[in-house]
Structures are given as structure tokens and as C-alpha cells.
Amino acid sequence: KSMIYLNDAKDTNGPFQLVKNSNSFFNAIKTSINLNKTYPNTRFTNEDVEKISQSKNLQTLTGKAGTLIFFDPSLIHRGAPLLSSERYAITNYYDSEHNYYNSIEKIPPECRF
């Protein structure tokens, strides 16, 4: 998955956050048990993320407009709570199993950059 900030993302306007190493199978099971959730539960509330981040490494990714972030969507992630202003971003999902184009050569010329 990727995301591009369309305006500056600061600590106060909901920057992207992720819990480091939360995508491993062992950590996912441990997190589910600690939160009394049935595994695999892929949805976490802001309260859940706050609890998780107290014992793990919550990473906040601030950046200027145009910043591109690539990340594994199986990581526990969110937009931080808004304290002021707004944060705009475009997200993109990629699924290699259902990818329409298998290689760059098959993309029509009018769609290339």
C-alpha cells in the first residue's frame, strides 16, 4: 500500500502512524489476546492502538506535501487523531494476485508517465 500526503502532515493534523513489527504472526496473536479479541481481528479502535503503543513502538510519519510512504497494510496503522487543521492524502492498494498488468511493457503508452 502507498500513500502520498497532499498537504504537510504535522504532529497536530493526523499524520500516518504505525506500530512497528505488528505485522508478524506471533505479534498479531499476542496483540489479539492482550486486547481480548478473537484472532484474526483486523480492526482496532483508537483506544486499542493507544494500548498497543504503550508497550510497542508507535511510529509517527510526518512529512511535507508530496511525501510518498510505502507500507505493509497488515501493520497496525491509522491516521493520528486530529488536534488541528486537516491532512489530505491519496492511498493506493496493490494486489499482485489480481494485477491487471503483469509487466510495465503491457501498459498502454497513453497511461505511462
Indicate residue ranges for each PLM-predicted region.
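Short, conserved beta-strand element in jelly-roll/cupin
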Residues: 1-11, 62-65, 70, 93-97
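Compositionally biased, intrinsically disordered low-complexity regions enriched in proline and serine
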Residues: 6, 40, 45, 89, ...
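Short, surface-exposed, charge-dense and proline/glycine-enriched linear segments
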Residues: 1-8, 43-53, 105-113
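Non-heme Fe(II)/2-oxoglutarate
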Residues: 34, 68-70, 74-113
